Curated annotation (Swiss-Prot):
Sequence intervals crossing the membrane: none
Organism: Dictyostelium discoideum
The encoding gene: mfeA
Keywords recorded for this protein, A-Z: Fatty acid metabolism, Lipid metabolism, NAD, Oxidoreductase, Peroxisome
Protein's UniProt keywords contain Nucleus: no
Listed name of the protein: Peroxisomal multifunctional enzyme A
Amino acid sequence: MALNFKDKVVIVTGAGGGIGKVYALEFAKRGAKVVVNDLGGSHTGQGSSSKAADKVVEEIKAAGGTAVANYDSVEDGEKIVQTAMDSFGGVDILINNAGILRDVSFGKMTDGDWDLVYRVHAKGAYKLSRAAWNHMREKNFGRIIMTSSAAGLYGNFGQANYGSMKMALVGLSNTLAQEGKSKNIHCNTIAPIAASRLTESVMPPEILEQMKPDYIVPLVLYLCHQDTTETGGVFEVGAGWVSKVRLQRSAGVYMKDLTPEKIKDNWAQIESFDNPSYPTSASESVSGILAAVNSKPADGESVLVRPPKVAVPKALAATPSGSVVVDGYNASKIFTTIQGNIGAKGAELVKKINGIYLINIKKGTNTQAWALDLKNGSGSIVVGAGSTKPNVTITVSDEDFVDIMTGKLNAQSAFTKGKLKISGNMGLATKLGALMQGSKL
């Protein structure tokens, strides 16, 4: 079935030519209302003209589509978004595509070379995304694409300015993916290889022929569709090839009384990727390191640092809603209190928290799970792993959980000491205390 964008409002920056033009044409072809933004400057950021954007709008309209031109700089992101609001009443999809090049070796780079590239790439994407953000939150829908490049992911000679800004967009995208997830706002990054006004000056003709912008567009349309759940991803794409990129971390080495000499002696092991891990969030990264250190390894021992995962036994499959008491677990008192609060103000809590928790309580060698759904309906809590994928997984001992929830143990301190392990949405973990407000045990 064809992916349809009927009545979706799409902003494409740098849409007067190259990849941006093909984005605009294809979105319009599939029913979207398109804001074609292009300042009309050169690939080095000089000059301006309305011709490029106007021609694309004319082409869209000639094919029966709907589009409007905008000639503002991406630094004036509010004006571009306002064009979408005035013309079509909203904004659903934002393609941060505009870019320039000011390539020069670092020793010859001027402040002007750096600042102009920053203003168009990093600041421009920020200004557009920020201007569109609250409109997307209100609609409970949004799709944002950041455009990085191989120069950002890996570095490239003569592109310290360009590469820095392109990597900055990866960080921005990753954070927006986390902040927007609860409001159905998805943000992904692409690193395209395609012929455009930017690349025609640095690639030979025979290579450019294989790098048509048409090969980039299908991935972007897929990522922007309302049925696509992918968010926080980084993808390299070009010439009919698509690949996902992720961070990889070596197993690492634990050393007591760390010294430069010990670093030197263990360097081969430090940089070995024989047993890598793949953290996907700051919380996973930190909790994995703390878990490794708190395991008290021997000096010089390799420590495999992975995000903590707790296997839930099959016997702990979710029970029907009802009693949340499990014999022998003091945490049952906490969950009973939470269950009462959900019954009294479930809809309010769902609106405030909007997340699903899997809480693994450890007691001796046993682990008992409770699933807390504060995302759907009026909320619910069951004994067991639940049937819905959690947004955050919390693992803690029975005693420490009770102390944290009753205010006797500081959660941040427990996390730092490795007593409290969190994977997934760290922000949701900080909201858990709200379930006990006003309650007494």
